[in-house]
């Protein structure tokens, strides 16, 4: 990652508890009050907003003498956005951090109008996000690239990472959904069904579909409940999951994807950041271009429609979209609710 002046940028690390404790109490309390009232947000969204606001107020502590949030001015917030740009953040990342602060300000305007009647949101619509030129192309991985990635991970005996890649790609799920997978799924029975597909020569043929369904998983949606679904995956995924658990051995953690202490004495559910690190630091190196957890979802939809010649509606069912128009945006050229044609 490079700065606008050409130097290598430091990564914006998460704010530690010690750093957050140094932020003035007024700002910390306002952030907590705001977040506690956002009942429409999912746990993942709340985590993202909390992280963005903590980064901002640590910057305020370091650069604006730890002043109260209601005293911050527009020109000072512009300095913050320039700081983010100079740290090498993408325009999308800066835009989210801008919207997080703006949402907090709107909360203060609406809920504390009697306490602070002169306060106005200093993050305005006309305030442009700095043009960093750092906009990542949404290029799905081809079937050959997916095969290469899986082959290399198998050669390296990275069984957990291989299981993650196969599960995430096969289901087309988001990284917050992969996180919830329980290891009990390896004991589930397969669903077998004869389906009719259209091959690359536009001829119909009947083939057997073999797939599995997970336990209930909370997917993207408003509120803490969100949209609850059972994700569907193929036999190759089941084989990879079983291989990972065989290597992992017995432990008390119910989750499929985990982190262990060096001595292996403690095992716990893995965090979001690990999936990002795997993709950016290792999978990107294997594939030869930038890869993210969400790119597996986009790649699955594209390859299903463009390479496997399945109907757009099949990809729609697999990804859990309410409208095929949403699925179409993923496809880059980009039970009746099941996507059985995806598993033949």
Feature roles, as predicted:
Residues 251-252, 276-317, 332:
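Short, basic (Lys/Arg/His-rich) helix/loop patches that form interaction surfaces
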Residues 203, 319-344:
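Catalytic-site neighborhood detector that most strongly recognizes the C-terminal catalytic loop/helix
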Residues 180-239:
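Conserved tyrosine-mediated DNA breakage-rejoining catalytic core shared by Y-recombinases
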Residues 143-175:
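Basic, Lys/Arg- and aromatic-enriched nucleic-acid-binding interface segment
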Residues 234-288:
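Active-site/catalytic core of tyrosine-dependent DNA strand-transfer enzymes
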Residues 130-148, 204-209, 223-235, 250-254:
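DNA breakage-rejoining catalytic core of tyrosine-based enzymes
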Residues 180-190, 316-322, 330-333:
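A short, basic/aromatic helix-end/turn motif that makes direct DNA contacts
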Residues 29-136:
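N-terminal core-binding DNA-recognition domain of tyrosine recombinases/integrases
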């Amino acid at each position: 990652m490079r700065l606008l002046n050409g130097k290598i940028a430091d990564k914006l690390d998460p704010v530690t508890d010690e750093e957050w404790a140094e932020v003035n109490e007024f700002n910390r309390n306002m952030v907590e009050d705001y977040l506690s009232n956002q009942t429409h947000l999912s746990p993942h969204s709340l985590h993202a907003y909390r992280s963005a606001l903590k980064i901002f107020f640590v910057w305020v502590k370091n650069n604006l003498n730890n002043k109260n949030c209601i005293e911050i001015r527009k020109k000072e917030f512009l300095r913050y956005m320039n700081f983010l740009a100079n740290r090498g953040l993408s325009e999308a990342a800066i835009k989210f951090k801008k919207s997080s602060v703006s949402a907090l300000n709107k909360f203060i305007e609406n809920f504390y109008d009697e306490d602070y009647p002169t306060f106005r949101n200093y993050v305005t619509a006309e305030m442009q996000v700095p043009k960093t030129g750092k906009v990542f192309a949404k290029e799905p991985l081809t079937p050959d690239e997916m095969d290469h990635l899986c082959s290399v991970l198998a050669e390296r005996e990275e069984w957990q990472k291989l299981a993650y890649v196969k599960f995430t790609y096969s289901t087309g799920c988001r990284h917050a959904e992969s996180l919830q997978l329980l290891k009990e799924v390896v004991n589930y029975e397969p669903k077998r069904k004869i389906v009719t597909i259209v091959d690359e020569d536009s001829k119909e043929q009947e083939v057997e579909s073999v797939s599995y369904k997970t336990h209930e998983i909370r997917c993207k949606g408003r509120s803490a409940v969100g949209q609850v679904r059972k994700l569907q995956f193929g036999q190759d995924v089941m084989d990879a999951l079983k291989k990972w658990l065989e290597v992992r051995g017995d432990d008390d953690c119910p989750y499929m994807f985990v982190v262990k202490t060096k001595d292996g004495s403690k095992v716990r559910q893995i965090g979001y950041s690990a999936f990002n690190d795997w993709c950016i630091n290792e999978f990107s190196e294997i594939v030869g271009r930038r890869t993210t957890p969400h790119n597996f979802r986009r790649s699955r939809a594209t390859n299903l429609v463009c390479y496997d010649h399945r109907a757009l509606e099949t990809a729609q069912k697999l990804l859990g979209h309410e409208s095929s128009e949403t699925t179409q945006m993923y496809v880059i050229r980009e039970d009746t609710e099941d996507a059985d044609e995806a598993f033949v």
